[in-house]
Amino acid sequence: MNIQALLSDKVSQALIAAGAPADCEAQVRQSAKAQFGDYQANGVMAVAKKLGMQPRQLAERVVELLDLTGIASKIEIAGPGFINIFLDRQWVAEKVEYALTAPKLGVAPVEPQTIVVDYSAPNVAKQMHVGHLRSTIIGDAAVRTLAFLGHNVIRANHVGDWGTQFGMLIAYLEKMQNENASDMGLSDLELFYQQAKKTYDEDEEFALRARAYVVKLQSGDEYCRQMWRKLVDITMAQNQVAYDRLNVTLTKDDVMGESLYNAMLPEIVADLKAKGLAVESEGATVVYLDEYKNKDGEPMGVIIQKKDGGYLYTTTDIACAKYRYETLGADRILYYIDSRQHQHLMQAWTIVRKAGYVPESVPLEHHMFGMMLGKDGKPFKTRSGGTVKLSDLLDEAVERAGKLIAEKNPDMPADELKQVINAVGIGAVKYADLSKSRTTDYIFDWDNMLALDGNTAPYMQYAYTRVVSVFRRAGVDETSLTLPLVVTEDREATLATRLLQFEEIITTVAREGTPHVMCSYLYDLAGLFSSFYEHCQILNAESEEIRQSRLKLAMLTAKTLKQGLDTLGIQTVERM
């Protein structure tokens, strides 16, 4: 049930009937204050200006023509021409009843699209670190949200699995006479990488051999391919442990590494030349873009093939977009990559559009994000200044949550305690990130993220346990609630209306890739339920009808909190 969309349609019809153009915008919004109704239509002023009318006069005409019979109990004009809409409580009650039993909480089915979501993208032969966290969990929240709405979502884990580093690793493994890479853990590989890089920088003979292995690998040499495959498999097996701990939906089947596009690169360079988009410049192949200027004000040159024949990330990203449209059949392509890559992506996509590889009708969207910072406002590091490994961060989260939860639950069975601690610890790290606007940097703070009050995972998880505890105490389940829902008290109406706004929220998150909007909604919902619970008797209500009615509101609150948190990849618990 998308009330905003319903009211927008009704107000638009009335505006058009009053003489507005067919493309007019009703600008229906949720009201910020109860005195202005549940919704407010703000589009009259802009339309009145176009029509040369007084806004108030047009608003009066729109209200005359606005048919909200059975939906609104009152419609008012405020100020110069705002239209305030107060929802009918009987209508609200009926819609809550529907949401309780309907699939997906009454969220309307969408026209399914094939949507490719590019996220996580760790590098082979390196452990995941905190720098991978934002892409991984924000991207996964988008995937979960889009899938919930009914879209065909293709997860694309653009793993860094190609390049000169593999020549170094294979050469160094050989040098160390440790060719059986399957016996190594990833920590060994990371150390090997560091030592290989040091040797590569200091030993010219070794560097030549490493470069030779790169050529052999690229030409399909069986030995090099086997070693490369082992390195990839070991890395992704370790990464899967992190994904599982994070409750992220990525699996090995979602890996679409850089190597996937290798065969396409020569064809793309040849095609861009044939189309007159790419030219030779000092031995390299370059695309000059008028849309981007260098410091001299001339079109910027984007290299797609070096003079030694090597390709660049831009070439791979062009191939990647082409593949996602032509082979995967994408209707929409989303990239969860940090903001520092924005110009690089825009240049690649400009070439993609000019070449006709992806039509304008298929959006290419960079859902960029800022950095995770320490309390000092600098990039989050270990005390010694090193990069924080993701596994270490998650270990600490669980350890800290353990102290918090064990103190409060001395009698909880060990298995349940372990599950709760894990859900709270991992949830705290994820929610702290997801609750911030992804476009901004944010401060990583253990105390804030594990707090049992405020907009945190522990608070939200505890709020959920409070709601479900009502049913344990009442000794009822959904099937025993047979009496109709009635909404009479203001707090009942406020909670019920907010519950019905779930579809508006999840639609916004799906459109804009902004999970913090869901976090804000759930936090608000938890607060409204708390107020309702304190002021409206549930178990000791004055009549059985009111008791069952309020239990139904509590039931939909529990379902909405659980579903909302699930779209964020946050696990709920029954006790805490």
Curated annotation (Swiss-Prot):
Gene3D superfamilies (UniProt xref): Arginyl tRNA synthetase N-terminal domain (3.30.1360.70), HUPs (3.40.50.620), Isoleucyl-tRNA Synthetase, Domain 1 (1.10.730.10)
Root EC class: ligase
Pfam families according to UniProt: Arg_tRNA_synt_N, DALR_1, tRNA-synt_1d
Catalyzed reactions: tRNA(Arg) + L-arginine + ATP = L-arginyl-tRNA(Arg) + AMP + diphosphate
InterPro entries: aa-tRNA-synth_I_CS, Arg-tRNA-ligase, Arg-tRNA-synth_N, Arg-tRNA-synth_N_sf, ArgRS_core, DALR_anticod-bd, Rossmann-like_a/b/a_fold, tRNAsynth_Ia_anticodon-bd
Keywords, in A-Z order: Aminoacyl-tRNA synthetase, ATP-binding, Cytoplasm, Ligase, Nucleotide-binding, Protein biosynthesis
GO MF annotation terms: arginine-tRNA ligase activity; ATP binding
Gene Ontology biological process: arginyl-tRNA aminoacylation
EC number, as in UniProt: 6.1.1.19
Record carries keyword Aminoacyl-tRNA synthetase: yes
SMART domains found in the cross-reference section: Arg_tRNA_synt_N, DALR_1
GO annotation, cellular component aspect: cytoplasm
CDD domains in UniProt: Anticodon_Ia_Arg, ArgRS_core
Coiled coil: none
Motif residue range(s): 'HIGH' region: 124-132
Annotated localization: Cytoplasm
Subunit annotation: Monomer.
Family of this protein: Belongs to the class-I aminoacyl-tRNA synthetase family.
NCBIfam families cross-referenced by the UniProt entry: argS
Record PANTHER family: ARGININE--TRNA LIGASE, CYTOPLASMIC (PTHR11956:SF5), ARGINYL-TRNA SYNTHETASE (PTHR11956)
Protein name per its UniProtKB record: Arginine--tRNA ligase
Species for this entry: Yersinia pestis
UniProt lineage: Bacteria, Pseudomonadati, Pseudomonadota, Gammaproteobacteria, Enterobacterales
Gene that encodes it: argS
